[in-house]
Amino acid sequence: MSDFLPFSRPSMGDAELAALREVLASGWITTGPKNQALEAAFCQLTGNRHAIAVSSATGGMHVTLMALGIGPGDEVITPSQTWVSTLNMICLLGATPVMIDVDNDNLMITPDAVEAAITSRTKAIIPVHYAGAPADIDAIRAVGERHGIPVIEDAAHAAGTHYKGRHIGWQGTAIFSFHAIKNMTCAEGGLIVTDDDELASRIRSLKFHGLGVDAYDRQTHGRAPQAEVITPGFKYNLADINAALALVQLEKLSHANQRRTEIAQRYLRELADTPFKPLTVPAWDHQHAWHLFIIRVDEAACGISRDALMEKLKAMGIGTGLHFRAAHTQKYYRERFPEVSLPNTEWNSARICSLPLFPDMTDDDVTRVISALRQLSGR
């Protein structure tokens, strides 16, 4: 059997090793100049005013929601078709996640669904840019503006994603992820961009103990030896070891996403006559980052269930992923919100399968995946 082909693998090389050696030799390995450089680079990438690096996108979501004052009695609109961390943070703050359905073919929320879910208790809207494609953010933001409700873009899948000619996060507030499987990674990490000066200040304080400075300010520059706690906060700062990796990965992002696009286009072409149906790319002007390539495996059409297909591919040495099992079908949310019914989300959640997609895949790797799927489809 050939070596196992994972569904994702980080692309690391000599440049990343050199960046790590530089930080280790510097004498300062936690939050410091590499963080500052990463934040400046993301302001340049997105065109937004503020960037705050954090230890994870989950931590970023936590402090952003808290900085907006969201708590008990409040509602936050979110898809169920997302990673559970968003809903977990909403619940941990004492607020209520209002889960809405997604478009059946691109798996992103629509402005109409958002509008229908708004109540007097709605305090935030969280659209997800899914699998590397952008949500229709202008239309969703317009709904929020009509009602005076802030929009927090979940851009965990959107490093390199463009919408109508501009990088996701060019205005408003967006949260990126640098987790190990993302288009750019530093193992664990995230970053918030925002054009709201006061929100940026609150987030920056909350992510580091509620202080008005970070570790680099306190211990290296000595600017605030008597720094005070402004409000109780957390420890979500990003180490410079991670930030150094992220900076190198950001330099490689365009080239890496180009390779992802080449692989995705092959999948689209060479699986077109099989019963495995990919997500539909959005109709609005965009540049897809192809974080994931997802097919829907409908047993009635394919002659095999999604779970059985994943097992057979695993036996053939090919890894797959599931992004995601709908949050409202998981134990805690199923028991707390038994009334939630989201037909499009539920149909897709039971059928979606993420195929191998990462920049270091060879053409032979891609051929291997396509051949296995064609074999399993009887084509």
Curated annotation (Swiss-Prot):
Enzyme class name: transferase
Recorded catalytic activity of this chain's protein: UDP-4-amino-4-deoxy-beta-L-arabinose + 2-oxoglutarate = UDP-beta-L-threo-pentopyranos-4-ulose + L-glutamate
Pfam family, one: DegT_DnrJ_EryC1
Keywords linked to the UniProt accession: Aminotransferase, Antibiotic resistance, Lipid A biosynthesis, Lipid biosynthesis, Lipid metabolism, Lipopolysaccharide biosynthesis, Pyridoxal phosphate, Transferase
Domain of life from the UniProt record: Bacteria
EC assignment: 2.6.1.87
Name of protein: UDP-4-amino-4-deoxy-L-arabinose--oxoglutarate aminotransferase
Annotated organism of origin: Klebsiella pneumoniae (strain 342)
Gene that encodes the chain: arnB
